[in-house]
Amino acid sequence: VLGSRGLGDVYKRQVLFAVIRFPVWVLFGFGVLYFGIKSLKIELNEKLSWLWSAIMLGTGGIFTAYHIQYLLLDAELRAKISDNKMLLNVLCCLVVFLAVQVFTSNTGLTCLISHIVLLSLAGINYFVYLFRGNEFIFSDLKSIQTGLSVAGNYEFVLDERAGYVILLSTLYIAFIRKLHVSFQKRIPMSIVCISLAVLCCAYIGKHTQGVVTETWEQKGSYRNGYILNFVLSIRDCFIAQPDGYSKEAVKELEDQYSKETDTATGETEKKPTIIVVMSESYADLSVVGNFSTNIDLTPFYDSLEENTIKGHALSSVFGAKTPNSEWEFLTGNSMAFLPSGSVVYQQYITDTPTSLVSNLKNIGYTCVAMHPYYDTGWSRNIVYPNMGFDETHFIDDFDQTKILRDYITDQELYEKIVDRYESKKSNEDLFIMSISMQNHGGYTEKYDNFDEKARMLGINYPDVNQYLSLIHESDSALEYLISYFEKVDDPVEIVFFGDHQPSLSSSFYPYLNGKGLSGLTLSELENLYTVPFFIWTNYDSGKESVELTSLNYLSTLALERAGIALPAYNQFLADMMEEIPAVNSRGFYSKSQGKFLHVEDAAGEDAKWLKNYEILQYNNMFDKRNKSELIFPYLKQ
């Protein structure tokens, strides 16, 4: 047992490492080599310290870079990386070796520390990829606390290749400890190491211009090499001013969208209570491919029509990074203009951003956030007060006996929403933003407290069956929520959407779409980023079907449906939606061309809309000195 984590006395999940069964000859050979190395006595000529150091550092960088690729990729994928990219990976590793050498002046110790650090980074990526289906990058470092909080619900399994990596690294470390090379004069050695590191960095920088950080599946490792891809993700943390950005460009947009306009559709005499449910991993997998199940998975969701806008929306994430979906909904901004793999809550929110929260607070709403998990997850304990939420409710505010698998149920979350509604003052306008946890991955373990009712017909994927059973449970809880608010007299609007699709067995996707997760067209790829949504009211608002939108537009649709005057930024989004109905981190849907395109391939009016969108988003997020208070009004104190 590696470890366990508890939530009070409720969560009891052990994390197990699989036993790797090596052939006898492998273990015998390892033993012979290991004890042979241990018995060696190696004395190096101190007069040749520079030569020995150069050999040790160079071979250490090469061995570590190739060792990492061997750990992360099978032979077929390893063969895809070009020699030039592999050289860049070796140089990245060498920079680490050189940097450590400056501080140790002991080349053997340098090689030991550098190899362990780099291999540990690759080891983290090894498990992160197993759990969420994409790779660990620099911005994920800020998510470590969140990752550790849910790590106990996953199985940590080492495959045979990982076992060989451990054996080879053990032999390397044992050998390197036999080599004693140190420098009495540290300053000359440090100058040489720093100079070489700078030259390596310059070479890497020159040859990575235009190279993008890959975050889809294992593309980072087999297109760029893992270490290089990680380094590129560091570069992406620095946001450049977009082309065409200026105060004058922002002023032009101010002149177009500086006045609020009333929405003529769906106005109500009293402002409605607005309830948002962002449902964890809630998805309709049939958009990816057809399959059959033994029961109807979401009969209640499917029945919703009256007073409902309903359809599908593009998320910008797959399998993880929930807060990016939350951020797109609340702010109207898009991950399309931010680096791949970034997490906005942990990287870019340092003050009070203009959002649905600030806009509703400015017209008198009490804003409440609910999330039945730890407040530190994705730094929500910092972000929510910055956003201006009046109340926050986290796991300690929920009944922790009401769990399914290891997470608070949707039913318990909805009952908490009802309780807060019933306790509101008679003249209180209420906005509740809730984020569920029930359906969180992984889906491989069996639980005594969960009777899985749904299963696929004709084929057996245990994790898929568990996921589908969870969605079925969510549907029952959703029926409770809607049924309750159907009966209340005051106007209520409920916005419901999934944050992203789940990360399931990689072997499931070829069955579902005939291709799997690789070699997809942009349109096929966007299917994996598609989630269901609806906006329902308990008052007359008509029914509408939306074939496709995106999460950044949903708050604008919600304000329109609620009869609330659109702030300037939402006016812009409403107009843009007419030309570009959906946009996310992967691309956008061009109405004029009738197909998905990458943002950089936009032309004509599409390019104009996207450029103005990027300018406004940059002004809102990064140009604090020149932020437009007309388009992005501050929260009134």
Q: What does each model-found stretch correspond to?
A:
Residues 1-14:
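Single conserved hydrophobic/aromatic residue that forms the stacking wall/gate
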Residues 12-221:
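Transmembrane and membrane-interface helices of multi-pass
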Residues 127, 131-140, 159, 243-247, ...:
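A diffuse structural propensity rather than consistent per-protein peaks
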Residues 141-144, 224-227, 231, 247, ...:
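Alpha-helix initiation and N-capping motif
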Residues 204-276:
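Membrane-interface segments at or immediately adjacent to transmembrane helices
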Residues 258-268, 279, 284-637:
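Solvent-exposed soluble domains appended to multi-pass membrane proteins
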